[in-house]
């Protein structure tokens, strides 16, 4: 599966940036998402999207406030990574 995804990404010239946290989404005139503002070691950078933005950001298992708000039960264990803090979900909700 990953081979097929990797091949399609390379064939289409799609750029993937790792370790590049998104600070906020950029909206266009009709409120569509037109790009992102990233922030890293080199400072903030605006990145325009040609055909869309994919938020591959995980869940919110490490965000206590969001768990209280959205989970009906109180799970004891989770298999998520520490980076699942709901940042991407909150950015999309802010639109």
Regions found by a protein language model. Name each.
Residues 40-95:
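Glycine-rich loop(s) and the adjacent beta-strand/alpha-helix scaffold that form part
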Residues 1-44, 50, 64-65:
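Conserved redox-cofactor binding core of oxidoreductases
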